[in-house]
Amino acid sequence: MSQAYSSSQRVSSYRRTFGGAPGFSLGSPLSSPVFPRAGFGTKGSSSSMTSRVYQVSRTSGGAGGLGSLRSSRLGTTRAPSYGAGELLDFSLADAVNQEFLATRTNEKVELQELNDRFANYIEKVRFLEQQNAALAAEVNRLKGREPTRVAELYEEEMRELRRQVEVLTNQRARVDVERDNLIDDLQRLKAKLQEEIQLREEAENNLAAFRADVDAATLARIDLERRIESLNEEIAFLKKVHEEEIRELQAQLQEQQVQVEMDMSKPDLTAALRDIRAQYETIAAKNISEAEEWYKSKVSDLTQAANKNNDALRQAKQEMMEYRHQIQSYTCEIDALKGTNDSLMRQMRELEDRFASEANGYQDNIARLEEEIRHLKDEMARHLREYQDLLNVKMALDVEIATYRKLLEGEESRINLPIQTFSALNFRETSPEQRGSEVHTKKTVMIKTIETRDGEVVSEATQQQHEVL
């Protein structure tokens, strides 16, 4: 109780002597400031120091000076302030000065620790800014070159693949047309082959009929030759018989002539025999000429028939040879067309297999490129998220640095003001006009939030914060 009373008495004496401070109150001269620590390790301090809470308030006055820095001791009540026209107590001022020097020493130690922590904090901020700059450069590089280049390569390869697909489609259509044409030619040749086979069968049937006719004509010719031989033999026999009859008649005529000569009374028969001989010779010549003419006519008829049959046989043989040659040529053509068709079908199957394999390869390339694009998009999204996180951390650190700067500037102003007061022994109170003439600094912090999904920007928001330093 006595200590609280003495402290209150000292404060009252000090206020009676110096008056209230313009920007702060000395409710606890022995206390030391404790700054809020964010992101640093906590270091132990002396147990005799009490905590001091600082409240920074912005003023919207005409000059816009620094906010008043108020300090209040926890668990104590402020002593009532008195006017500035009271008398000076030098013994109390010396005691207060000694206590203030001790407090000043402790505050220097704490300020050194805070400076070390602040230096570490600045180093960490610089390191994070370097990482942020590197990540931003990487993001810009990926955003500016890699996706565009990958897209160009993808589009170029897709155009090449489409062109190859069109070429292969045209080749396949042309091969299909050629195959259809060859199938039509093959069907036409098969129909022509069937017609030629029918013509060959008809020719063979005609040839068989002609062979029967030739055989019949040959038999007729042989029969006629035999008849001619028999007629010739008959003619020769008749000639012999006629000659014998003539000889007999001549012999008889000679005998009769002898008898006539011997018997003069008998009539003359020479003229009669001559007439008979002439008649027989005429009849024989007529028969011979008729037989020869009939034989010649028959022989000529048979010869003509044989010639006709031979001509027909020769023509049939020629036609058969021609048909055989045509059949052989058509067979060779069919074999060649079959070979061409087989080769074209094999080429078509090879083209289809190659087209299928190339299409599979192109599909694999497309899938690989799409996977690379997705991977790059994921990487870009990850870098954007990291960049956004680092940007948020940087903004928070900037805000915290600004807060530390304001607290340090307020503490320096609070510390420097009593020193100037004690050194100059200037017991005049600072007027409100002088406090309002201090220059303030206004800082604007822009926080830009970008939300991405699968590498694409979904939403973008911008927030501005105004701070007065």
Swiss-Prot record:
What does the record say about PTM?
ADP-ribosylation prevents ability to form intermediate filaments. Phosphorylation at Ser-7, Ser-28 and Ser-32 by CDK1, phosphorylation at Ser-60 by AURKB and phosphorylation at Thr-76 by ROCK1 contribute to efficient separation of desmin intermediate filaments during mitosis.
Tail: annotated segments: 412-469
Q: Residue positions of the PTM Phosphoserine?
A: 7, 12, 25, 28, 31-32, 45, 60, 68, 81, 289, 357, 423
Where are the Asymmetric dimethylarginine modifications? 37
Please state every residue range assigned to the domain named IF rod.
107-415
Q: Return the annotated region ranges for Coil 2A.
A: 268-286
What gene is this protein translated from? Answer: Des
Region annotated Coil 1A sits at: 109-140
Q: Where is the stretch described as Coil 1B? A: 151-251
**Positions where Omega-N-methylarginine occurs in the chain:** 16, 37, 70
Please classify the protein's predominant subcellular localization into one broad category.
Answer: cytoplasm
- Gene Ontology CC: one annotated term: Z disc
Region of interest: Interaction with CRYAB = 437-452
Which species is this UniProt entry from?
Mus musculus (Mouse)
Span list, region Head: 2-108
- Report quaternary structure and partners: Homomer. Interacts with MTM1. Interacts with DST. Interacts with tubulin-alpha; specifically associates with detyrosinated tubulin-alpha. Interacts with EPPK1; interaction is dependent of higher-order structure of intermediate filament. Interacts with CRYAB. Interacts with NEB (via nebulin repeats 160-164). Interacts (via rod region) with NEBL (via nebulin repeats 1-5). Interacts with ASB2 isoform 1; the interaction targets DES for proteasomal degradation. Interacts with PLEC isoform 1C. Interacts with PKP1. Interacts with FLII.
* Annotated keywords: ADP-ribosylation, Cell membrane, Coiled coil, Cytoplasm, Intermediate filament, Membrane, Methylation, Muscle protein, Nucleus, Phosphoprotein, Ubl conjugation
Q: Where is this region: Linker 12?
A: 252-267
Q: What name appears for this protein in its UniProt entry?
A: Desmin
Which Pfam families does UniProt cross-reference here?
Filament, Filament_head
